[in-house]
Amino acid sequence: LGLIGIQISRPNILKTFISEKYMIEVELKFPVASIEEIRSHLQSLGAISEGVSIQADEYFNDPKRNYAKLDIAVRIRQSDDEFWLTFKGPNLDPAAKIRKEIEMPLKDALAAEQMRGVLAGMGLVSVAKVMKRREEFVGCDDLSCVHFCLDEVAEVGGFVELELVVESQEGVEPAKLKLIALADQLGLSGSTRTSYLEMLLESRESTLADSPTGPRENQQE
């Protein structure tokens, strides 16, 4: 089934706001041709819909450091009327995708705009905004709950993410096996660890290269 992405999720490093407990998120992501087909499969397996949200993920970069080369990410996410600041650290494993994730809720749109000002004051610039429609399902057994995200990403395509959170490293391997089995049941194959931001920028670069005028010089991503 390809590569398996593993992310370590940790609440915000600012102890004032969020606790210090670590979580390990095991994730598989697959491109799909038909979201509707996967939705039907999930419903037949008994997964429960948690609703639909429209998400806008705005990513930022420090031009002097180049976050892409450092393999880190800073973003502000708007999910309907909720806002979050997220930092994703570099991959911690050469074979699997293991990342530290630090996330802090922002009170409202004004707080999100103020945070953009803070990031700008630190020298960060907006790179791109990833827009997607996300429909979430959850399926639980006696041991755990698996979250399924059906994503329709603007300029990129359709994807399904399978996510399972465990509390210790010992739970990672069983979680991977469980997700692989579920992916088989859903008929999914060809998993990817490429982020939506990377896909979006690659798509835009390809479109620009194919345009009659070709790529513009010194374009800032």
Give a label for each model feature.
Residues 1-22, 215, 219-220:
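N-terminal amphipathic/basic-hydrophobic helices that include classical n-h-c signal peptides
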Residues 15-21, 90-94, 148-156:
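Short, flexible, solvent-exposed loop/turn segments with mixed acidic/basic and small polar residues
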Residues 21-143, 180, 186-221:
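N-terminal strand-loop-strand beta-hairpin
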Residues 134-158:
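Charged, well-structured binding/catalytic surfaces in domain cores that contact anionic ligands
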Residues 165-170:
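A generic structural motif
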Residues 173-182:
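Acidic (Asp/Glu-rich), glycine- and aromatic
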